[in-house]
Amino acid sequence: MKISYNWLKDYLECDLSPEAVAEALTSIGLEVDALEQVEEIPGGLAGVIVAEVVECEDHPDSDHLHVTKLNTGEPELLQVVCGAPNVAAGQKVLLATVGTVLGADFKIKKSKIRGVESFGMICAEDELGIGESHDGIMVLEPEAVVGTPAKDYLGLATDAIIEIGLTANRVDAASHIGVARDLYAYLKHNDIPCRLNIPDVSAFAEGEGEAIPVEVTAVDGAPRYTGTTIRGVKIAASPEWLQKKLLAIGLRPINNVVDITNFVLHEIGQPLHAFDAAKIKGGKVVVRRAAEGEKFVTLDGVERTLSAADLMIANAEESMCLAGVFGGEDSGVTESTVDVFLESAYFNPVSVRKTSKRHGLKTDASFRYERGADPLAVEYAARRASLLIQEIAGGTVVGKVQESYPEKIVKKTVDLDYDRIENFVGKKIGHDVIEEILGSLAYEFVEKREGGAVVAVPSYMIDVYRECDVVEEILRIYGYNNIELPSAMRMSVNAPQKPEPEQVRKSISDFLAANGFVETMNNSLTRSEYYSKLKTFPEAKCVRIMNPLSSDLNVMRQTLILNGLEVIAYNINRQITNIKTFEYGSVYSFDPETDGKTLASYEEHTCFALFMSGQPDKSWRVDPGKGSYFQLKGYLELLLKRFGCDIYSLETAAAPADLFSEGLSYALPGSHQPLAVMGTVAPARLKQFGIKQPVFAAEISWPALFELVRRNKIKYKELPKFPEVRRDLAILLDESVCYADLRKSAFRVGKKLLKQVGLFDVYRGDKIAEGKKQYALSFVLQDLDKTMTDNDVERVMSKLLSTFQNEFGAVLR
């Protein structure tokens, strides 16, 4: 946002230089991105001076040129050839000396014109850029002092443009008065002489006659709406002072009425809109929602299709303006306008934001409305603009100001405890200093008591709700640099946690990256509609954002899975179909059974999530096959195994059906603490994101995983000296028997001799009865003390088969 230094000083009298102002603004949280010195005329007419024509004779080889000699204040006269018809001896003129650059690139050089040398140029108004006349040279007053720089003689203004990187919560500073208010508080606190001048609008008066009425049918979109009717205006170019102010901040002057609305916008921060009253059909203004599919042509000449959610300013027959965003092509002020309807309103920030985003329109008005304009500045801005219109464009206010304001907006109040504020600040700054700073920031003291107060927050400070917000305001003005660091730090030293969480996390990330997974980082904010149909993560448990910038980012995520599906959908839409990703991040939830006023109502913890979808590219050597549920389970098993954890030792249950069509959830044995959930993502969730290929996902609770890692201490063993023996076993089982149960029983029976169990084939079909299946199992046996004999092996295998027969009804094949 651009602020003109000269314009700023209209409201704040102080002796600070532009550089000092920029430094002060940065210190109070309005970070200055750039400071640019500008001149009324580019270059400041450097090299142009006042000179006196001492001699003027006709050119010997021309019927219209003159050879002049000028006194420039130097001992010798300067010869210049001039073609102006009005040049004469005795005149005081403006001379561009050799080396001067006029305009963009017109450089004055020593030249020879028809055989006569010339050492400069006597200038006309248009050549200097101060007018449009080229009828002759510019003749100055006789009192002009020879040698005076043109910049000083003409009184050309210099200015400094301060560019502020405004954060989303500081819309109160999106104007010259807004910046002046903040700067005033800073200067006053630091005992720097200053005075705040807010333009007086007490001269505004309503008139006689009948004003254009206002009807608001969408009060939720326009909580406050006013309209002022001004008749008999004369549309013309704005006065020079107004044009200069707008040009200084990069705005193009249009006409006096439109320029006044832009001026007030950047002066106060309140957007205004001027309508040609003659184009308001039916003689009334209606604030309503658009009809679904309604067509509307905006000022840029583009026909737009409206949504039923768009708020419109209309007349009795048709729409005239996208409320708070952009005007219509046929309703604006033109040269033929005589009567004006001036709108000043407070529009719902969410409504404006959605309309602005939906139609891809970003304007100065929408910038302020969607961040939250000052609802109590509506009347002041209307009066200020009306007085300026009457002063500059003429006309009179007709009738009463029309207003729709069904529910009065009151200032927020905050209860303050001064001792608690000083604890927040980290320094005893004094109760009187707290009150002095708040007073300079225009806080009103509703109630004062010993050690505290109740204050009314200025209506333009839309981000201040709580005591901690007020503390931030106090700190901005007091100065973070004035909070000294203590000479000694008191802290308890804790032994580092073993194993260190960050090392475990890095080890997991390295493992996944080595196996082809790509790490992603998603926004913790997401949209609430993702949770509207979930039972596992119900929408009621979402932590909601108080002032969301967008409905797409209005809650904190409860799970990483939905964000991961967003990433997969994004990549698939860009022809990337083979996807393996993982993410480490926080998830949040809220207990809807509580009042939400304490931290106990909220929960935050971190998770790992893995995602697989698609099929890797084939090579001439190998067909990798499609990703599958079991492939993802294998990665999870290997991941846990790295930290000495056996996935088969965990408690298992079915994965939640609203997230997975098939899958398992795991919990720590004994404590039942949830560890992970994994499986094939349910079709309903895939449809939600427009994904048409299978997706396999897992979400792992970081606290539970770290607890598992902490429990299972890794032990190092000597490499075995004696060989392994492998045996296979094919058995017929009921469909209800699962491999995990067989595996547990096998290790219970095999004890120290059984090293590995594997399932290498599952068969159903011909010669297998319905409800039955055949498992082909492999067993790896090893004795660490000796080489196993055939008898040793057969003894173990017999025990295994007997166990399977007794516990699971297995039949040897």
Model-derived features with residue positions:
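Phosphate-backbone binding interfaces of nucleic-acid-interacting proteins
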Residues: M1-A205, F341, G360, D364, ...
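A carboxyl-terminal module marker
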Residues: K2, G439-V446, E467, N522, ...
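Beta-rich nucleic-acid/ligand-interaction surfaces
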Residues: E40-G44, A203-A205, V264, A456, ...
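Conserved mixed alpha/beta core segments that line enzyme active sites in large multi-domain catalysts
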Residues: I49-V81, G147, Q243, N255, ...
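Extended, well-folded interaction surfaces typified by the phenylalanyl-tRNA synthetase beta subunit core
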Residues: V414-F582, R727, V780-L784, D792-R813
